[in-house]
Amino acid sequence: MTAIAPVITIDGPSGAGKGTLCKAMAEALQWHLLDSGAIYRVLALAALHHHVDVTSEDALVPLASHLDVRFVSTNGNLEVILEGEDVSGEIRTQEVANAASQVAAFPRVREALLRRQRAFRDAPGLIADGRDMGTVVFPDAPVKIFLDASSEERAHRRMLQLQEKGFSVNFERLLAEIKERDDRDRNRAVAPLVPAADALVLDSTRLSIEQVIEKALQYARQKLALA
């Protein structure tokens, strides 16, 4: 009997540093990577490429079931590969974002994408980045980490990111948006943003990203008995 590949789930709110941590862990362990937050955007882009109606659940389900997507982390950069093509930039357009919100509203599409996400589980292992990876998608994962940070710290990090890109931002507005999103995510009826009962809750508020990576890798290696 073939042993099932291990999964490390990294859940947490927006701006906690999940993406950076997941890329670093995938590279350190040489494991596969799943960015669940990008899945709906990738499906939306595939629908646009193949002229599939994003308002038709019946048309979207088969596309979701056979979505040809890979995530590759190289030197800290995440490449999103759809049907052999790097679409990392294309999935960030407003057109794709709008289409993604439409496709995400269909229950059967969500179910098809849930199965598709579980199919990423492959040897030697998978790092799964999301909001309900440890509670819904991979409830049997041997290592679960919930990465958190104060709303103020996450707003500060987001402000710096936007300023580096040349945007003028208002800290108070950013903070209000983050608090509103937190409240929505934590109180929604389906798959609320909460740590799994068996997850390590790692608060990154006062930690550097290097310290977060070190703590997460140390915990994962202990749990999995990796060298």
UniProtKB/Swiss-Prot annotation:
GO cellular component labels: cytosol
MF term (GO), any: CMP kinase activity
Compartments, record wording: Cytoplasm
Residues engaged in binding ATP: G12, P13, S14, G15, A16, G17, K18, G19, T20
Source domain of life: Bacteria
CDD domains: CMPK
UniProt xrefs under SUPFAM superfamilies: P-loop containing nucleoside triphosphate hydrolases
EC number: 2.7.4.25
Catalytic activity line of the entry: CMP + ATP = CDP + ADP; dCMP + ATP = dCDP + ADP
UniProt keyword annotations, A-Z: ATP-binding, Cytoplasm, Kinase, Nucleotide-binding, Transferase
Keyword ATP-binding annotated: yes
GO BP terms in the entry: nucleobase-containing small molecule interconversion; pyrimidine nucleotide metabolic process
Broad class of where this protein is predominantly found: cytoplasm
Presence of the UniProt keyword Ubl conjugation in the record: no
NCBIfam families associated with the record: cmk (TIGR00017)
Family to which the UniProt record says this protein belongs: Belongs to the cytidylate kinase family. Type 1 subfamily.
Protein name: Cytidylate kinase
Organism annotation: Citrobacter koseri (strain ATCC BAA-895 / CDC 4225-83 / SGSC4696)
Native organism taxonomy: Bacteria, Pseudomonadati, Pseudomonadota, Gammaproteobacteria, Enterobacterales
